[in-house]
């Protein structure tokens, strides 16, 4: 419920930029936690942080969490294209209300280069049947490990090696940590 455009955040952004620390910020809708203010859901509210030199990871790529909510995936896509250090993660995208974003992410290579893996465990991944078909969807439900299921779905959707390795680059992890 913090508005990222609030001027009181500026010293925090300056500190993050100075120490080259990324900011993971929730974007889009949220129904798994109570009392979320929908007025602070747009990725556009992170413009001041980007302007100050902060690397941003927009959780959920600005997607809605329920029908009827405002969806910001197009705002995310524009910001990802416009700002070198603006990324989004795919956490919880394997939910029926968020999986529509796969079209934007997978079909626009410029945007896809700004997407990193996220799982949002323990949110249960539900395969997007409209993209994978009913047989593949049923097959994925046989996987009892939700983290593995999330990964297998994204692999089947066509997420490439760069996607799986991008978080290590964005988070500036040392090679031995990233490959562990």
Predicted regions and their residues:
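Short amphipathic alpha-helices and their capping/turn segments at secondary-structure boundaries
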Residues: 8-17, 44-48, 103-110
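Proline-rich intrinsically disordered, low-complexity coils
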Residues: 4-7, 11, 34, 43, ...
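Helix C-cap/helix->beta junction micro-motif
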Residues: 18-19, 52, 82-83
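Active-site gating/metal-coordination segments in enzymes
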Residues: 1-38
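Aromatic-anchored, glycine/proline-accented short structural segments
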Residues: 27-76
């Amino acid at each position: 419920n913090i508005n990222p455009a609030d001027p009181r955040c500026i010293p925090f952004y300056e500190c993050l930029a100075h120490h080259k620390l990324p900011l993971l910020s929730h974007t889009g809708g949220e129904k798994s936690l109570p009392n979320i203010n929908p007025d602070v859901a747009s990725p556009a509210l992170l413009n001041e942080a980007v302007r100050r030199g902060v690397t941003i990871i927009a959780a959920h790529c600005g997607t809605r969490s329920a029908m009827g909510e405002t969806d910001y995936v197009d705002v995310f896509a524009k910001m990802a294209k416009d700002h070198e250090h603006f990324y989004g993660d795919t956490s919880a995208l394997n939910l029926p209300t968020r999986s529509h974003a796969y079209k934007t992410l997978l079909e626009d290579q410029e945007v896809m280069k700004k997407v990193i893996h996220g799982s949002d465990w323990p949110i249960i991944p539900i395969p997007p049947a409209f993209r994978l078909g009913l047989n593949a969807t049923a097959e994925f439900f046989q996987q009892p490990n939700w983290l593995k299921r999330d990964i297998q779905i994204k692999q089947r959707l066509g997420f490439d090696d760069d996607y799986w390795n991008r978080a290590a680059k964005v988070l500036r992890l040392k090679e031995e940590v990233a490959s562990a």
